[in-house]
Amino acid sequence: MTILEELNDSSIPQRLDNHIFFGSVHSLTHTDFLVENNIRFFINVDLSTELISHIYHEVRSKFAHEIVIVNIDNDSQIPIESDLVRSFHWHNTSLLQQLIHHLDFLSGINNHGEPLTPPPESHYRNAYVQFDHPSDSVSILDKLLYGNKSEYSRTNIFQVTNEAKFQVFNDLITIFKYSIAQGGNTNSNILVLSENGSTDENLISLLMSTVLKENPTFNVYQALQFVKSIAVIPDTVRDEKILWVTGFINYQELIKKNEMYWGLGSQKGRKLTSFASPISKVERKQRRRDDQNIMRSKLPQQRQNPFCSTERPKRARCD
């Protein structure tokens, strides 16, 4: 019995917006649905990389086109030595790398105003590609992402938690949606999967963060009601568990900073620091103001201008 046969049930993905579907891992058994809805991109949340690797090799042949699968898996014991996992990781990282480079090529600009020249196709068909982007070049994709674009070219397995998890999830959504828009195939779609679909608090909070990013004037309760209006969420899933998922509140503040305070794509609100490299497991540290670490320079005493003295002048005596 194959992995897909073991997972088989009646779960059908639900639609979040024009290009995003979501559901449980069982959705992968409905290959007819996936093909009919032209699912090209898969984002898996909190699923075993080993499980996804097995499923990938079973479903890949059922698609007439290449699919890209990424996995947000915080398991520190990913069996990368497994041939299936290694093949899954290698092939999808290459595709993701190729996709990002192609989007940069389509944007057509670098620091010198010259088009970026893509490498010959044979360079990236069956191997990792090391792209040399000028460090000071800024593409359209750079402006759309909250994180560092280069981090998404290095792997298709993202071991992140907390706020970094929300950032990686939404940056991947942005990359895939931008690819759909630039590729001219507006029928392509994204499928977001978790173990139990709409009964997973983590998945619901991630979907809410996407709604908030697309609608920054929404508050968190409006986002929750929107997701509830399109998803079948059982009563056992409590609102407070969704709203208080670790990192969700911090990511809401990051959305406001980027999308409202300084406008969409503004560089002012972006974190171009090590926080933009969550793949290397660098957790964002909350910076707290520590008065003991602030060096205070002694300010010079302001000299009083005699012409601006507030003291009442003495009248001259005429003796």
From Swiss-Prot:
Keyword line: Cytoplasm, Nucleus
Q: Cellular component GO terms, alphabetically?
A: cytoplasm; nucleus
Q: Where is the composition biased (Polar residues)?
A: 299-308
- Where is it chiefly localized? cytoplasm
Q: Tell me where in or outside the cell this protein is found.
A: Cytoplasm; Nucleus
On the tree of life, the source organism's domain of life is Eukaryota
Q: Where is this region: Disordered?
A: 281-319
Recite the other comments: Present with 1360 molecules/cell in log phase SD medium.
Protein name according to UniProt: Uncharacterized protein YOR342C
Q: Species name for this entry?
A: Saccharomyces cerevisiae (strain ATCC 204508 / S288c)
